[in-house]
Amino acid sequence: MKHRIQHIHFVGVGGSGMSGIAEVLLNLGYTVSGSDLSESTVTRRLADLGLKVSIGHAAENVADADAIVTSTAVAGDNPEVIAARLARIPVVPRAVMLAELMRLKRGIAVAGTHGKTTTTSLVASVLAAGGLDPTFVIGGRLNSAGANAQLGQGEFIVVEADESDASFLNLLPVMAIITNIDADHMDTYGHDVARLKSAFIEFTQRLPFYGSAVLCADDANVREIMPFVSRPITTYGLSSDAQVRAENVQADGTRMRFSVRRQGREQDLPTLEVELNLPGLHNVRNALAAIAVASELGVADAAICQALAGFKGVGRRFTQWGEFPVAEAQGGGRYSVIDDYGHHPVEMAATLAAARGAWPDRRIVLAFQPHRYTRTRDCFEDFVRVLGTADAVLLTEVYAAGEAPLVAADGRALARALRVAGKVEPLFVEDVAALPQAVRDFMRDGDVLILMGAGSISKVPSQLGEHA
């Protein structure tokens, strides 16, 4: 690629899926520039690394580029896209550029509706602990690396494969992990679950004849596609027939302890005694996927256990912000704050269950900002059911993510339905900007607050200390 393409420009470079690819290309020696609508910690970090970042989109930003990279969030009438097409500069989808990066290494791609970012991070961390020095491109910030991407000197590249727009079908990994298959982003698949499953089958068919698939045996939809996977399979989970299986699972605060039995191709491998620095059964499954990959690649058992015990987490995945003071009007004291990206009912249920396991005797308060009107509509009853499992709920208006409002699929409708269900009396806070003060007025000593959503609620944790 480099003999013809030297300067690559990213439209929307601050996006989680874009910034990592840009950083790796910069470290490979390419000239990389990018633009975004607003400045952020991501764009500032990229600028510090030497990437030229423009705030705002303008035709002149692409004047010297040999190729421009776009994500599905970038519209066709973007001035940089128009200018590139007029100048016959190639306009490359993000997933296609990621596929080009993967051609330089042996690719390990993590797909699935939930758990991709954490699983990708765990795989990268375990391989790094085993001395394999992988390159990785992740959809979230790996805390131990301080970044969501890193260029390693080893032969493997570990990437997060995005099914939301079916772009994961551009990738050509040698190992494919599927964590689960659930109904989300169904506009892409014509609201047809069969088409969604077919896409995951096709994803495994992109593997070479010497490739392999690592599949979660606990997920019913993943089990359904197994007969159609034509490559060697390693299954993982808590199911009795999983080849990499967790037993004796116990919560220890925000850590999990469990034993792992592993069926080898010729003989069983030694049982591992694992301490995972993450809470919840869903994270036990994510760790099992990483263990399956590492065992296949010959990573030493001690390195696997060390990486999992010392895992420092991923940004906005059950991120603990510490304790904050309770207002004197509420009796004083302290409450704990957790920040989480979860925005689908399945993810929310897993996070709430993890919190219950970590703090069984404390009040769990959920502050939730729904993400997209279409998801709120499609998962409405499931949202009501999951929200009702919290001890108390603060609910904001939907974060639109560019969508037009839908009747009976907004935050008020969710609050009404939750009230009718009778399990919890929600506090509706229409403007998320008012949420920090609402939280201060609501919390009591010993409470655990979980701030959850994929939108602007991510800014709230840093605002809670103000005026406390």
Swiss-Prot record:
Q: Where in the cell is it found?
A: Cytoplasm
Q: What is its EC number?
A: 6.3.2.8
**Which residues are ATP-binding?**
G112, T113, H114, G115, K116, T117, T118
Indicate whether rRNA-binding appears among the record's keywords.
no
Where primarily located? cytoplasm
Highest taxon above the source species: Bacteria
Pathway noted in the entry: Cell wall biogenesis; peptidoglycan biosynthesis
Q: Which NCBIfam families match?
A: murC
Protein task: Cell wall formation.
According to its UniProt record, which protein family does this protein belong to?
Belongs to the MurCDEF family.
Q: What protein name applies here?
A: UDP-N-acetylmuramate--L-alanine ligase
Native source organism of the sequence: Bordetella avium (strain 197N)
Q: What is the lineage of its organism?
A: Bacteria, Pseudomonadati, Pseudomonadota, Betaproteobacteria, Burkholderiales
Q: Which gene encodes it?
A: murC
